[in-house]
């Protein structure tokens, strides 16, 4: 009985195939776990707009607590995010909006006239 040695894989071929399979399975498992965990985190985190004063106040209080928990007290620094404690009445804000709108129309018309030559 003659055994053809060309059909028998060598030790290095078997070893490299055996180490690739578990490594490939590990990579696939990590990718799938990352997608599952990433999807749950994305569903839980919903950002609220900071133009609402309550949301803005909550955001900055949580940010300050985060830094304080890591040993950095932001109370010793000047306030880089000033909040408007006494907002103007609505009539002043509408005047500013009307003024800004008039300025925009003026610039738009002057640019249009410039293009006409």
UniProtKB/Swiss-Prot annotation:
It is found in: Secreted. Pfam families: DUF4720. GO terms for cellular component: extracellular region. Its main location: secreted. Keywords: Secreted, Signal. Residues 1-38 form the signal peptide. It comes from the Eukaryota. InterPro entries: DUF4720. Disulfide bonds: none annotated. The keyword Secreted applies. The keyword Signal applies. This is Uncharacterized protein C2orf66.
């Amino acid at each position: 009985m003659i055994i053809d040695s060309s059909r028998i894989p060598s030790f290095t071929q078997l070893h490299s195939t055996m180490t690739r399979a578990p490594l490939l399975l590990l990579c696939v498992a990590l990718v799938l776990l990352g997608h599952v965990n990433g999807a749950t985190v994305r569903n839980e985190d919903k950002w609220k707009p900071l133009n609402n004063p309550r949301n803005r106040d909550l955001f900055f209080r949580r940010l300050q607590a985060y830094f304080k928990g890591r040993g950095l007290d932001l109370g010793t620094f000047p306030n880089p995010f000033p909040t408007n404690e006494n907002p103007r009445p609505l009539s002043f804000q509408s005047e500013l909006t009307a003024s800004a709108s008039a300025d925009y129309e003026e610039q738009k018309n002057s640019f249009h006239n410039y293009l006409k030559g």
